[in-house]
Structures are given as structure tokens and as C-alpha cells.
């Protein structure tokens, strides 16, 4: 696929404002404007990502395609990132659509799971809007989420759309409104898209039309209302599985526990090694073991002399004394 797919994936991650600090034109998820070319944008891990997403010591590595470098098999993420970001893709015979969820609600759900309490998860969309999640079905196949734009009245003849449904853009909303008007489904005089950092689509209603009826028609005949069908399919232990979002979160929380335990084990090992080295150095100096090597004629003889001199103190240590310890 070349590097285009890498750039597209990076832009999707950056636009969700969680893992990446972005510099340059990264596009706009509200208007659908694309990001600038890869050479014009810059990225770095956010503070959150540096703490939660990457740890060189707990990462499983594999050789790169040419065998000259190493690359991670997976990243040891201590957070249900898949549920926070959402995912949408297809493969041969498989499709997956995982909706994004609220950051704080995911944290609270993880805490509830670890405390043995029940929890429920529902999607939360970066574009806003109002959602009917009564048929969410835990994100599994067969469920559906109905999402509506937020439409308010400015005056009797003016409507404003300030939030849009997930999977739409202000451009697609505007186009659908114009098409509905051309077909006679709604009656408007003008529609303007003034969106920048926030959604703002202004609709001028025809003088002979009720604004309430126009709002109903917008939901019925335009992209102001869409239905999204989730289909949570994930790769678990190298095989595809259809799992509900609650089960995905449980497994993520348990994996995070394992990763934190692994980090503590590694840190404990490092501290034990530091204590071992400091203890050997102290024994060597305080007991003047360096005097044992003064008459030695070879390096091997000196190593043996030091090892023998350490013999009375080995019971105090937490592990055996190795040749590398003596050489140090």
C-alpha cells in the first residue's frame, strides 16, 4: 500500500486528540477537509501516550522486514484504546465497526470491573449530536444506534445546526439538505456552512413553511439523522472474535493489570541488581579484597582470588555471584 496508508492512519489517530500532539494542517473531522500532505505535518506522542501506550521494556519485539532493526509486535497499551478511538474496516470475509466511547466513562467502567461491580458502555461521538442507544446491543452485530444532529431555532425563520451525527460532515449535511430541497421534501430559502472550530450551519426557512415542520423534515429526509450498525470484531490471540464492548473492556482491564505487574517485576529486578552491585562493591572495599589481587600473575587468577574472598559474604546476597560480577 505504500506509505499513504501509514499517513492516513496517523491522521485518524491525530484527529481524535488523544495519543498524538499535532503540528500543521491535520484536516477537520467536522467539515471533512483532508489533512495536508505528510511532509507538511508533524507529530509526537502526547504525554498521555508516552505514559500509557509505550514502554520499551514490556514491548514484545520482532525483526523488521530486512532483519536489520527491531519493531514492536504490539504496543503494551494500559488503556482500552480501541474503545476510546473506535475502529472501522473490512477484510476478506470480515468487517468490523467499533464506535468510539467516552474517555471518563471507560475509566469508570474499568474501575467498576476491577471492583467487581456491573457497568454499561454506550458510544460517545466527537462530532456531538443526540443518540438513541436503546438498541446498541453491547456493540455486537444486529444492534443499531440512531444519531441526530442538534438543531435549534434562532428565530421564526432561521435554524442553526450546531452538532452533527457521527459518520457525517457539515459538507455532506449541507449537500443532503440541498438535495432534499430540490426534491420538494423541505422548503428552505438558503443554507450556509460557517463551520470552523465548531459546527455552524444556518438554514433560512421559507416564509410559508413552519420551522417545526422543517426540523421534522430535516430529520426525515437528510443526513441530520443517521443509523449506525455496530459490529465489534477484534483480533484476540491471533484470531478474529466477535466480542461485545463490555467484554473487550474486561479483557483490556485484565491485560492492563498484567502489564502493570510486569512493569513492577522489571523494576524490582533492576533495584535488586543495583543493590547486588552496591553490596559487592562495599564488601570489596571495606574488607580490602583488592589486596588479594596484588600478587596475581594473570587475570583468571585474580578473578579466582576475588571470588574466593567473597565466599564468606555470599550468604548475605540475594543471588549467586557470577563471573561478570567479579569482572565488574
Residue ranges of predicted features:
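Extended, highly charged linker/hinge segments and catalytic-adjacent loops that couple domains
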Residues: 27-39, 149-152
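Short, conserved phosphate-binding/catalytic loop or strand-edge motifs used
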Residues: 22-29, 195-197
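Secondary-structure capping and boundary motifs in well-ordered enzyme cores
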Residues: 1-6, 37, 41, 71, ...
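Conserved short loop/turn motifs at secondary-structure junctions
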Residues: 1, 28-34, 66-67, 94-98
Amino acid at each position: 500500500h505504500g506509505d499513504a496508508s501509514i499517513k492516513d492512519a496517523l491522521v485518524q489517530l491525530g484527529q481524535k486528540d488523544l495519543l498524538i500532539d499535532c503540528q500543521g494542517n491535520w484536516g477537520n473531522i467536522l467539515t471533512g477537509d483532508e489533512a495536508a500532505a505528510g511532509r507538511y505535518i508533524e507529530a509526537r506522542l502526547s504525554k498521555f501516550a508516552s505514559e500509557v501506550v509505550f514502554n520499551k521494556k514490556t514491548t514484545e519485539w520482532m525483526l523488521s522486514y530486512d532483519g536489520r532493526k527491531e519493531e514492536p509486535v504490539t504496543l503494551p497499551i494500559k488503556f482500552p484504546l480501541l474503545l476510546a478511538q473506535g475502529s472501522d474496516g473490512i477484510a476478506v470475509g470480515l468487517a468490523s465497526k467499533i464506535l468510539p466511547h467516552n474517555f471518563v466513562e471507560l475509566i469508570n467502567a474499568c474501575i467498576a470491573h476491577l471492583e467487581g461491580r456491573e457497568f454499561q458502555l454506550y458510544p460517545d461521538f466527537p462530532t456531538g449530536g443526540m443518540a438513541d442507544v436503546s438498541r446498541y446491543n453491547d456493540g455486537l452485530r444486529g444492534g443499531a444506534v440512531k444519531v441526530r444532529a442538534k438543531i435549534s431555532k434562532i428565530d421564526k425563520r432561521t435554524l442553526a445546526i450546531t452538532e452533527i451525527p457521527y459518520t457525517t460532515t457539515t459538507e455532506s449535511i449541507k449537500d443532503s439538505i440541498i438535495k432534499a430541497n430540490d426534491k420538494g421534501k423541505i422548503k428552505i430559502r438558503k443554507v450556509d456552512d460557517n463551520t470552523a472550530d465548531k459546527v455552524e450551519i444556518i438554514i433560512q426557512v421559507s416564509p410559508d413553511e413552519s420551522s417545526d415542520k422543517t426540523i421534522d423534515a430535516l430529520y426525515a429526509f437528510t443526513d441530520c439523522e443517521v443509523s449506525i450498525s455496530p459490529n465489534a470484531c477484534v483480533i484476540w490471540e491471533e484470531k478474529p472474535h466477535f466480542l461485545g464492548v463490555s467484554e473487550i473492556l474486561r479483557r483490556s482491564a485484565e491485560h492492563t493489570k498484567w502489564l502493570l505487574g510486569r512493569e513492577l517485576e522489571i523494576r524490582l529486578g533492576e533495584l535488586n541488581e543495583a543493590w547486588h552491585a552496591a553490596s559487592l562493591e562495599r564488601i570489596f572495599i571495606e574488607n580490602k579484597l583488592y589486596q588479594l589481587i596484588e600478587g596475581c600473575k594473570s587475570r583468571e587468577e585474580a578473578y579466582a582470588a576475588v571470588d574466593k574472598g567473597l565466599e564468606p559474604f555470599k550468604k548475605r546476597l540475594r543471588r549467586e555471584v557470577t563471573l561478570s560480577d567479579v569482572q565488574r
